[in-house]
């Protein structure tokens, strides 16, 4: 074999590389062994995962339930459930056997009592008394046992009822301190409706009584000069009805229809469909005085104040429309005006007659 002939530094380098290579091979072998061990640990036996049906520890009922391959968790769960059933059966069997033993002991006691020798009548009486006492004691014992069983059953029933009550959903109740006036309430709405109807009826009845009241009106037939008259009529009388009755007082107007007559109050021409009640209710005023007063009086004052409205009331005028058309450019008919289309606006301070209010202000 040929030898490498070189410098000492090259030889050292070769030896270092060989050692490094050996170390790497060792590390690779260690990793391979570690992987093999991990694979072995992850592999489970079929007996660990499943258990055969022919296991001697399981009973016949569990063998019937575990047909075929069953996971070990299911297998153990089935065994636990079966053991619980067996325990409950054993407890019931013990109770029954105890009851049977007690009954047998009672029967044996009765037999012993009957087999006792009867030496005298007193002994018989005593024996009968003892037998009766024993029987009573035995009956009391049976009754006590039955009562205890009934108590246990009742306690179990009460526990079940309490559990059911706890499982029920608890709903929140209403808070009586909360204001619920904004919520719809049929009863409250019906009461409010009845109250409104009652108040409306009372108001209408009151207005009808006011309309039926009589008052005196001073008027004149105006044809350039006044022919004054006075008449009594109800407050609900319309202007048309008043003109129909008033024209009969004058010979000149007996042949004139109501449609050709005009009614003027305080320089305002009032339509025929209005009533005196409307004029009084509106508290309106005309150009020279109030429209709701139909008597005649003058407001005489020592000091005239232009800021305070006068209380003078003038007589109403009844005029033929033909005369008005001919003389409407002459005083006083030149001052007359038709009532506005909106009628008596009580919110209009220019038309509303408020003497007392203005006196209070000034």
UniProtKB/Swiss-Prot annotation:
Coiled coil: none annotated. Residues 83-93 have a biased composition (Low complexity). Residues 122-147 have a biased composition (Acidic residues). One of its GO terms (biological process) is chromatin organization. GO terms for cellular component: nucleus. Residues 80-103, 118-174 are annotated as: Disordered. Belongs to the FAM50 family. This is Protein FAM50 homolog. The lineage of its organism: Eukaryota, Amoebozoa, Evosea, Eumycetozoa, Dictyostelia.
